[in-house]
């Protein structure tokens, strides 16, 4: 398989999985197990491509927050988005400076998929008894920020799953409201991560080793696919639970543990 086709497939995979609660990083690690490993920069760029999709999908909401910033509700919502981002940025930077790196084997990803799937089922069962609430509290904002760090440390956890379900557990029980907040927090989070990685690689003189055609194709594929997925998901969760995604995670994790040789 050519490098360009591999990049295209990885971009599509990123767009499909970044916003579904099934772990994009986990799926990319699994895919790269067979398609060949890519650089951290490549992975961050395609994540940024997927975030472009969020900007496009929520462009009206973003415009509403910007033009209506003088309104108390909009202003507080923006401040809570900022708080979630700052928690992720500060704690994430500490973790990064500590030298934490992604696992090179698939087994930890498989276990994270299974544990995350069980966690989703338990939270769904608990929140089903609660009234629908769409108010983002400061506790929810801080929790979402921490959940994003956990997802970055443990691939297979899923940034969207950990953050959405913690938000639901902390009181933001309406799925669409929780997903919207998490996706909007993802905009500054992923763009900041992309910029940080770009600067680190530029200082190390590693950017010249990137195949920019591959990166560009993967970025566009992730953006286009991500746009379709986010539009679909926001409609889907208005009348459906996340149960199907939880079952998929558990099944995929179990299959990986059964089929892959020990140490893979």
UniProtKB/Swiss-Prot annotation:
Principal localization?
membrane
The UniProt entry's sequence similarity note says: Belongs to the UppP family.
Subcellular location, in the record's words?
Cell membrane
Q: Tell whether Cell membrane is among the UniProt keywords.
A: yes
According to its UniProt entry, this protein's organism is: Stenotrophomonas maltophilia (strain K279a)
**E.C. number(s) listed in UniProt:** 3.6.1.27
How does the record say this protein sits in the membrane?
Multi-pass membrane protein
What gene makes this protein?
uppP
Annotated GO MF terms: undecaprenyl-diphosphatase activity
Q: Single GO cellular component annotation? A: plasma membrane
Which of the seven top EC classes does this enzyme belong to? Answer: hydrolase
Indicate yes or no for the key word S-adenosyl-L-methionine: no
Residues crossing the lipid bilayer are: 38-58, 75-95, 106-126, 136-156, 181-201, 217-237, 242-262
Q: Which domain of life is it from?
A: Bacteria
Describe its function: Catalyzes the dephosphorylation of undecaprenyl diphosphate (UPP). Confers resistance to bacitracin.
Catalytic function, reaction form: di-trans,octa-cis-undecaprenyl diphosphate + H2O = di-trans,octa-cis-undecaprenyl phosphate + phosphate + H(+)
What's a single GO BP term from this record?
Answer: response to antibiotic
Lineage, broadest ranks = Bacteria, Pseudomonadati, Pseudomonadota, Gammaproteobacteria, Lysobacterales
Which NCBIfam families does this chain map to?
Answer: PRK00281.1-4
Quote additional remarks: Bacitracin is thought to be involved in the inhibition of peptidoglycan synthesis by sequestering undecaprenyl diphosphate, thereby reducing the pool of lipid carrier available.
The protein in question is named Undecaprenyl-diphosphatase
Q: Which InterPro entries match?
A: UppP (IPR003824)
Q: Which UniProt keywords apply?
A: Antibiotic resistance, Cell membrane, Cell shape, Cell wall biogenesis/degradation, Hydrolase, Membrane, Peptidoglycan synthesis, Transmembrane, Transmembrane helix
Q: Which PANTHER family match?
A: UNDECAPRENYL-DIPHOSPHATASE
